[in-house]
Regions:
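Small/polar-rich, solvent-exposed N-terminal microdomains that initiate assembly or binding
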Residues: 1-62, 87
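Short, charged interaction patches at domain edges and termini
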Residues: 1-17, 60-70, 108-138
Length: 138
């Protein structure tokens, strides 16, 4: 059954428990609370400053399918870093793709829909993102 919040929680847990991503975000020795401040489940925020790095996990509009009782929810993952560290965002997104593509989330596989390339973000920062989809019964 469709349960977007639980699905988003699982994706956040997968990403926030990966040592390579934590290393890229300079969070390898951070507390769970500090990690949760940098790997968030929403697209809107206004508190990036200095050398902050952040991953945002959120839903985009679902796609319809040929079967009226199923839907294809779309999860977007963005990485925001200081502009001079754009290569870190690209490395993070590469790792996210490896972690999530064909990964089972609540008994449903996630599939990479597309890489989004560079996305708008706050001045002085760089953002890269990608989208994943899965099929769920309504």
């Amino acid at each position: 059954m469709l349960d977007p919040n639980t699905d988003k929680d699982v994706v956040q847990e997968i990403i926030s428990s990966d040592s390579e991503i934590l290393n890229l975000l300079d969070l390898e020795s951070a507390s769970n609370l500090e990690i949760a401040k940098h790997i968030i489940k929403r697209s809107r925020w206004d508190d990036l400053a200095g050398n902050d790095k952040r991953i945002s996990i959120y839903f985009r509009p679902s796609r319809s399918t040929r079967n009226e009782i199923t839907v294809a929810p779309v999860i977007q993952v963005d990485c925001h870093v200081p502009a001079k560290q754009d290569y870190i965002a690209e490395k993070v997104m590469k790792r996210v793709k490896i972690l999530l593509h064909k990964r089972m989330v609540n008994n449903r596989p996630l599939y990479l829909e597309s890489s989004l390339g560079e996305l708008p973000t706050m001045p002085g920062f760089y953002c890269a993102g990608c989208r994943f989809y899965y099929y769920s019964i309504i």
